[in-house]
Each structure stands twice: as structure tokens, then as C-alpha cells.
Amino acid sequence: MSGNSIGQNFVVTTFGESHGVALGCIIDGCPPGLELTEADMQHDLDRRRPGTSRYTTARREPDEVRILSGVFEGKTTGTSIGLLIENTDQRSQDYSNIKDLFRPGHADYTYQQKYGMRDYRGGGRSSARETAMRVAAGAVAKKYLKQVHCIEIYGFMSQLGPICAETIDLDQIEQNAFFFPDASKLEALDEYMRELKKSGDSIGAKISVIATGVPVGLGEPVFDRLDADIAHALMGINAVKGVEIGDGFGVVTQKGSEGRDLMSPQGFESNHAGGVLGGISSGQPIIAHIALKPTSSISVPGQSMTAQGEMAEVVTKGRHDPCVGIRAVPIAEAMLAIVLMDHLLRHRAQNQDVRSLTPVLGMR
């Protein structure tokens, strides 16, 4: 299997399976001298960790990360950073009934056809369990971005099923299990999830992620545009079926006079473009949204077939998230951080000495 790495200067490579011994990652390209301990990563890992609320999977993994290399006396050395998280709460027997069955909507069929075999225990490498290492690597990037360049990244759930956030209160995001910014909708979310779990079904969600303090100039046109790499990274998250930058698909109904971000010496008047113009960061906040499909691991019976091509009915056992979007916020933050970190280092390598006479614009 290829495709386990992302980035050019800041490179993150992950390994491991859902029910394997451990998950791990290697980070190449992190600058030396960054103060780094396990605690710097643990906060975001705890935000993603399973079993923390009644709305997520009952699988309980401590997700305690260990630094294996690349850090000496509390600081990064500039060499490869090795990270490891052990799996401790696997129940592989829960998946014995699908050993020879393909779960509709999952990667079972495509993995079998591509590799001639598959790890049926929790989906193996295709499981979102792998994203724990992305979150750990993203936490390293987030610390460097904030500490050295004052770039901050935050995400929130903007929609769960039919329930949309109508107000954005950033102080609310970490105060509830949904990472939802609208406190007036929490009761409705709780009731909706209760009924959903009773029915044995699942639901999709929309996650928004924003980066502030991003300098103008990040992005490498033509094929390594900043928004293209952000979309690539976010689309690589399990269950993501759509990505928007700025107004995204909303631009279809906009007129040019409405969607352009007017500017003056005092700054931009709007940010319909989501902080990227011509594939290069404009200095405005980077704004992206992702749509996550409902998980197909549900207890509602569904038609499928066996590995031998015979018709069969599938009921997925095991412990699963009724809405995978609930734990996707720190994952989306991590992927955006990894892309920005990579592009920041690439920009520094080529354009560090560039001095433009044009004033840098902010938001009015």
C-alpha cells in the first residue's frame, strides 16, 4: 500500500490498523528547537478519543501517545519525530460475523478487490482509528504555527443531520460533546441522537474549520495551490464526501458583483473566497467546510453479498459512532495545520527574502 504520507517539507507518514498492536507516525521536516512533550499532543487526542460521551462509540482507548525519537531534553532536534499509540481495547470477535461478508458503504469490497485480502477487524487500515496519528502530528504543527507565527486553528460542528448552527459562539465549542457553537440547539441535538441510537441508524454532519493569522503568500500555483492541498487533506479524512473553501458551492448562485471580495487600503470588505485567491493565501482567515457521510456500520439489516458472490444480509455488530462527525473536529483541525505547516516551510525556503512594496491588507 502506498499513499501513507502527506506533505513535501513537513511530511507526515502514518501506519497501523484498527485492531493491530499499535498506531504510529513519523514526522519529517519539523524545525529544531520547538519545545515538545506528550502533553502538547494529548489534549487534542483526548478531544478525538473514543468512549468519552454517550454519543460516540463505546470503545475505550486511552490514546496515550509516546514520543520515540526526534526530541531531546524537551526540544525537537530536527530529525524524524516518531510517535506511537498502543491499541488496548480491541474486540475483534465482534467482527467474526463479517469475515466473509462485505459491509455496504464500507471499504471491504474495494480493499478485497485491490489487495486480494483484507483485515476485517474493525476495517483494518481503512478505519478512522488511524486518524489518531494525524491528530498527534497535527498538534505538533499547531504548536509551531501558533508559537512561531501566531497562527491559530479551530473547528466546530456546524450541522448534524437537519440541525444547523444559527449562531457561532466560539466559547461554546469546547463546552459540549458535539463541539457545537450554538447553545440553543444542544437540547435538540441530544434528543435527535437519543432517537437515532434507539433506531440503530446513523447520521451525517458538516464540520467547519478556520485558521486565523495566516500570512499572505502561502501556496504554490499551479498544481500545489493552497486550497487544492487543503481540499486534498480534508478529503482524505474517513467518511468525508465533500469539501468547501469559503462559500464553496454557494458561489453557484452568486453574481460576480456579490461574490468578489472588494478591497481598499483599509482592507478586504468580505471573505467569500475563504482566504485563498489564485491558490495563494490572502492574509484573511482560511475557512473550509467538510461533509461527512453517515457511517454504514449500523444495526439496521442491509442487503449485501459474501466474498464468494452469494447474496447475504448484513447487520453490523461492534461499537460504532452513530455520527462520525462528532469526533471529526480535531481531525479537520489537524489536517489543516499539517497543510499550513508544510506550505509555510515551502514558502520560507523560496520566498523568505521577497519584499513587496504593496501594503498587506486585513479585514475592515
Swiss-Prot record:
GO terms for molecular function: chorismate synthase activity; FMN binding. This reaction introduces a second double bond into the aromatic ring system. Keywords: Amino-acid biosynthesis, Aromatic amino acid biosynthesis, FAD, Flavoprotein, FMN, Lyase, NADP. Homotetramer. Belongs to the chorismate synthase family. Pathway: Metabolic intermediate biosynthesis; chorismate biosynthesis; chorismate from D-erythrose 4-phosphate and phosphoenolpyruvate: step 7/7. Its cofactor is FMNH2. It catalyses: 5-O-(1-carboxyvinyl)-3-phosphoshikimate = chorismate + phosphate. It holds the Pfam family Chorismate_synt. HAMAP family: Chorismate_synth. GO terms for biological process: amino acid biosynthetic process; aromatic amino acid family biosynthetic process; chorismate biosynthetic process. One of its GO terms (cellular component) is cytosol. PANTHER family: CHORISMATE SYNTHASE. NADP(+) binds at residues 48, 54. PROSITE patterns: CHORISMATE_SYNTHASE_1 (PS00787), CHORISMATE_SYNTHASE_2 (PS00788), CHORISMATE_SYNTHASE_3 (PS00789). Its EC number is 4.2.3.5. Residues 41-60 are annotated as: Disordered. NCBIfam families: aroC, PRK05382.1. This is Chorismate synthase. Reduced FMN (FMNH(2)). FMN binds at residues 125-127, 238-239, 278, 293-297, 319.
